[in-house]
């Protein structure tokens, strides 16, 4: 992804275990009025025959709102995954996982639609998306 695509972020995205395939329903952790997000595609995945595209922490996905405000439902929104239940390994060797899968709705530039995030945000996501990091309550 280009620097502009991640909201002007710098630095490489390290490989992490992908725990959220297309079709997964994740919690919406911002104050936009959406309760959950249904992943319909993952940005930047080219694909392989019969393999479901999957997302991990820090990935931008295209999602629809299944529960929430009526004005958000039945539309496709870009979102960024901020937490996942599947454990992944950090460069220092520690394995980390969260108690839920969660994401936040953003625009195409990576700027958040909401103004607050409930719960922790993964450090990998905060490094890639500065606008999400600035709204995060805690970074884990």
From Swiss-Prot:
It comes from the Eukaryota. The keyword Cytoplasm applies. The keyword Ribosomal protein applies. Pfam families: Ribosomal_L14. SUPFAM superfamilies: Ribosomal protein L14. One of its GO terms (cellular component) is cytosolic large ribosomal subunit. Transmembrane segments: none annotated. The modification Phosphoserine is found at residue 17. PANTHER family: 50S/60S RIBOSOMAL PROTEIN L14/L23, LARGE RIBOSOMAL SUBUNIT PROTEIN UL14. Component of the large ribosomal subunit. The ribosome is a large ribonucleoprotein complex responsible for the synthesis of proteins in the cell. Component of the large ribosomal subunit. This is Large ribosomal subunit protein uL14. It comes from Pongo abelii (Sumatran orangutan).
């Amino acid at each position: 992804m280009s620097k502009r695509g991640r909201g002007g972020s710098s630095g490489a995205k390290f490989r992490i275990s992908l725990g959220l395939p297309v079709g997964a329903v994740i919690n919406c952790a911002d104050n936009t009025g959406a309760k959950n997000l249904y992943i319909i595609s993952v940005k930047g995945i080219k694909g392989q025959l019969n393999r479901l595209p999957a997302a991990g922490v820090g990935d931008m996905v295209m999602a629809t709102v299944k529960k929430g405000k009526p004005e958000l439902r039945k539309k496709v929104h870009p979102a960024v995954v901020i937490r996942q239940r599947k454990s992944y390994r950090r460069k220092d060797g520690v394995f980390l996982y969260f108690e839920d899968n969660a994401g936040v709705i953003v625009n195409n530039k990576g700027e958040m639609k909401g103004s607050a995030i409930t719960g922790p945000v993964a450090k990998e996501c905060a490094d890639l998306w500065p606008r999400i990091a600035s709204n995060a309550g805690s970074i884990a």
